[in-house]
Swiss-Prot record:
Keywords annotated in UniProt: Cell inner membrane, Cell membrane, GTP-binding, Hydrolase, Membrane, Nucleotide-binding, Protein biosynthesis
Location(s), subcellular: Cell inner membrane
Chief location: membrane
Top-rank taxon, per record: Bacteria
SMART domains: EFG_C
Keyword Cytoplasm set for record: no
EC number: 3.6.5.n1
Entry-linked InterPro entries: EF-4 (IPR006297), EFG_III/V (IPR035647), EFG_V-like (IPR000640), EFTu-like_2 (IPR004161), G_TR_CS (IPR031157), LepA_C_sf (IPR038363), LepA_CTD (IPR013842), LepA_IV (IPR035654)
UniProt record similarity statement: Belongs to the TRAFAC class translation factor GTPase superfamily. Classic translation factor GTPase family. LepA subfamily.
tr-type G domain mapped to chain residues: 2-184
Name this polypeptide is given: Elongation factor 4
Record organism: Janthinobacterium sp. (strain Marseille)
Length: 597
C-alpha cells in the first residue's frame, strides 16, 4: 500500500488540466500512442467542445520512479465548474493529494481557489504546479506569489512544466510521490468504499466508480449501499487505465469500478458508502448529501406529438445525471412539457444541448427561475419554483428569496465596472481585498439575479478576466412580485416572471415592447399588457392589418365610405372576440434577452 498514490488535478477552465492528464497517462503507458487522443478522459462530445470536464473519470497508472520503485498512481479527474462542486468534493475526499495547476501566464482564478479550499478543508495535500511555462507571456514569479498570497500554501518549490510540450511532467510525478502521503486503511476491516461517481452503461447497467477506504471487495460478494439501503450482487470489479480492466479484488487504498447489475442510477448515489451485506460497516463515510437543484426551467417540445419522445430522452439523461430532476407540467400556451431542476446555469445549458444533440429534440425553454419560500397568511410555507404556481398576492404574508455568497476575482483595472454590475444586480458588498494585482470581492446577491445573465455580463464587463463562484447562504425576506403578461387580456402562463418590485415596471415594459416586435400582425388589434396582480403597468399594441375597402369608391358621398368603414370595423371587432393569437417561439426567448439597464 505504501506505493499507492491517489491524486486529482485542480485547475481553472483552460489552465491545462486535461492536457496534463493526457501527458501523465502517456508517460505511464496507460494507453499506446495509437489509442491516445486529446482530452482522453473527457468522454462526452460536449466536454471536448466546451473544453470542460463534467463527469469524474479515473486512470490507474503504473509509474517507475527515479528511485527504482514502481508506484501505482490513481488519477481521479474532477469537474472544475462551480455547478458541479459537490462532485468535486466527493472526488477530492477520495484522494490524499491534489495537483494545483495554475497557468503561469494568468495566475490564480476563482474556481481554482474554491476547489483548492475544498481540498484543504478535506485535509488533502496540495502540490502546486505551474503550467504553460513555455508561453512567452509566462510569469512564474508572479504566479507563485499569487498562490502563496491568495491560497496561503508554500509554493516556493512549485514544479514548472508545460503539458503541451511534455516538459517537466516527470518532475510533477516525482514531487507527487514525495509530497503526497500513501493511503491509510485496513484491508481486513469491514468494507467501506466511497462512490466517487456512477453512470449508466447500456450493457452492464450502473457502473460505480469507488475509492476503497477499508476492507476488500471481490466478485460474487453481496454489497449494501448505505444511503439507498439496497443490496446487490457484485458481478465484476476492476480498474480503469482509462480502458477498463477486470481484477480479482479491490482492496483498501485502491480506486476502481464495481458492476453489480444495478438498474437505476438512483440506487448508486455519488458520495454514498458501499459495504458488505454480510459484514456491514458500523457507519457510512462522512460527507454524503442529496444534491438539490437550484435553478428551474420549463422544457416543452415544439411539436406536441414529441412529448413522449421528450419524456424518454429525459429518462435516458437521468440515467447518467442523478442531479437532473423533472416533473410533468402543463402550460396553456405551450401545451404539455416538463418542469426541470438543474444544479446551475451551466448544467441547464448542457442538458438542453444534450437533448438537442443526442436525442434530436426541438425545445422551447422558459426563463430560468429559482425556488422562492412563500409564507402565507395562515402561517404555512410553500416552496414555489414556477411563476405560474405563485399564490394570489392577497394570501401572501411574505416572500423569501435565496441569497448566495459570491466570490469574485479580477485584475485591478476592472474593479469599478464589476462593482457597478453587482450593485445593479442588488448585491451587497461584504468584503474587498487586494492580492498583488488581483482583487477579491465578496458579495451577497439574490440568486435570481445570477441565474439570468450575470455570468455573461461579468465576462463582458471584465473582458473575460473576472471569474466567480457562488454558494447558497440563506432565504431572506424580499419584496418580489410576479409580473403577468396578458395578450388580448388573457394571461399567458409561460411568460410570467418573478422580479423585484424595483425592477418590475422596467422589466414589464421591456418585455411588452420586445413582444410587440416579435408577434406578427394579425387581422385584428393585439393588446400586449404587463400586470402585477390587477394593476396594468404597461401596454403595447400590435396594429391590425386591414384591407383598403375604399379602393372601389371613386369620389361619391362620404356616407357611402363611412358605411364600408363601419362594416369593416364591426367585422374586426367580431374577429377579435373569437380570434386567437399565435405566439412565435422567439417571444418566449425574449424574456431571457431583456437587459436590466
Amino acid at each position: 500500500m505504501n506505493n499507492i498514490r491517489n491524486f486529482s488535478i485542480i485547475a481553472h477552465i483552460d489552465h491545462g488540466k486535461s492536457t496534463l492528464a493526457d501527458r501523465i497517462i502517456q508517460l505511464c503507458g496507460g494507453l499506446s500512442d495509437r489509442e491516445m487522443e486529446a482530452q482522453v478522459l473527457d468522454s462526452m462530445d460536449i466536454e471536448r467542445e466546451r473544453g470542460i470536464t463534467i463527469k469524474a473519470q479515473t486512470a490507474a497508472l503504473m509509474y517507475k520512479a527515479r528511485d527504482g520503485q514502481v508506484y501505482n498512481l490513481n488519477l481521479i479527474d474532477t469537474p472544475g465548474h462551480v455547478d458541479f462542486s459537490y462532485e468535486v468534493s466527493r472526488s477530492l475526499s477520495a484522494c490524499e493529494g491534489a495537483l494545483l495547476v495554475v497557468d503561469a501566464s494568468q495566475g490564480v482564478e476563482a474556481q481554482t481557489v474554491a476547489n483548492c479550499y475544498t481540498a484543504l478543508d478535506l485535509g488533502v495535500e496540495v502540490v502546486p504546479v505551474l503550467n504553460k511555462i513555455d508561453l512567452p507571456s509566462a510569469d512564474p514569479a508572479n504566479a507563485i506569489a499569487e498562490i502563496e498570497e491568495v491560497i496561503g500554501i508554500d509554493a516556493s518549490e512549485a514544479v514548472h512544466c508545460s503539458a503541451k510540450t511534455g516538459l517537466g511532467v516527470q518532475d510533477v510525478l516525482e514531487s507527487l510521490i514525495t509530497k503526497v502521503p500513501p493511503p491509510k486503511g485496513d484491508a481486513t476491516a469491514p468494507l467501506q468504499a466511497l462512490i466517487v461517481d456512477s453512470w449508466f452503461d447500456n450493457y452492464v447497467g450502473v457502473v460505480m466508480l469507488v475509492r476503497v477506504m477499508n476492507g476488500t471487495l471481490r466478485p460474487k460478494d453481496k454489497i449494501l449501499l448505505m444511503a439507498s439501503e439496497s443490496q446487490h450482487l457484485v458481478e465484476s470489479v476492476g480498474v480503469f487505465t482509462p480502458k477498463s480492466i477486470s481484477r480479482d479484488t479491490l482492496t483498501a487504498g485502491q480506486v476502481g469500478f464495481i458492476i453489480a447489475g444495478i438498474k437505476e442510477l438512483k440506487a448508486a448515489k455519488v458520495g454514498d458508502t458501499v459495504t458488505l451485506a454480510s459484514r456491514p460497516a458500523a457507519e457510512p463515510l462522512p460527507g454524503f448529501k442529496e444534491v438539490q437543484p437550484q435553478v428551474f426551467a420549463g422544457l416543452f417540445p415544439v411539436e406536441a406529438n414529441q412529448y413522449d419522445a421528450l419524456r424518454d430522452s429525459l429518462e435516458k439523461l437521468k440515467l447518467n445525471d442523478a442531479a437532473l430532476m423533472y416533473e410533468p407540467e402543463v402550460s396553456q400556451a405551450l401545451g404539455f412539457g416538463f418542469r426541470c431542476g438543474f444544479l446551475g446555469l451551466l448544467h441547464m445549458e448542457i442538458v438542453q444541448e444534450r437533448l438537442e444533440r443526442e436525442f434530436d429534440m426541438d425545445l422551447i425553454t422558459t426563463a430560468p427561475t429559482v425556488i422562492y419560500e412563500v409564507v402565507l397568511r395562515d402561517g404555512s410555507i410553500l416552496m414555489v419554483d414556477n411563476p405560474s404556481k405563485m399564490p394570489d398576492p392577497s394570501k401572501i404574508e411574505e416572500i423569501r428569496e435565496p441569497i448566495v455568497t459570491v466570490n469574485l476575482y479580477m485584475p485591478q483595472e476592472y474593479v469599478g465596472s464589476v462593482i457597478t454590475l453587482c450593485t445593479q444586480k442588488r448585491g451587497i458588498q461584504m468584503d474587498m481585498s487586494y492580492h498583488g494585482k488581483q482583487v477579491k470581492l465578496i458579495y451577497e446577491m439574490p440568486m435570481a439575479e445570477i441565474v439570468l445573465d450575470f455570468f455573461d455580463k461579468l465576462k463582458s464587463t471584465s473582458r473575460g478576466y473576472a471569474s466567480m463562484d457562488y454558494e447558497f447562504k440563506e432565504y431572506r425576506s424580499s419584496d418580489v412580485v410576479k409580473v403577468d403578461m396578458l395578450i388580448n387580456s388573457e394571461k399567458v402562463d409561460a411568460l410570467a416572471i418573478i422580479v423585484h418590485r424595483a425592477n418590475s415596471q422596467y422589466r414589464g415594459r421591456a418585455v411588452a415592447a420586445k413582444m410587440r416586435e416579435l408577434i406578427p400582425r394579425q387581422m385584428f388589434d393585439v393588446a400586449i399588457q404587463a400586470a402585477i396582480g390587477a394593476n396594468i403597468i404597461s401596454r403595447e399594441n400590435v396594429k391590425a392589418l386591414r384591407k383598403n375597402v375604399l379602393a372601389k369608391c371613386y369620389g361619391g358621398d362620404i356616407s357611402r365610405k363611412r358605411k364600408l368603414l363601419e362594416k369593416q370595423k364591426a367585422g374586426k371587432k367580431r374577429m377579435k372576440q373569437v380570434g386567437s393569437v399565435e405566439i412565435p417561439q422567439e417571444a418566449f426567448l425574449a424574456i431571457l434577452q431583456v437587459d436590466d439597464k
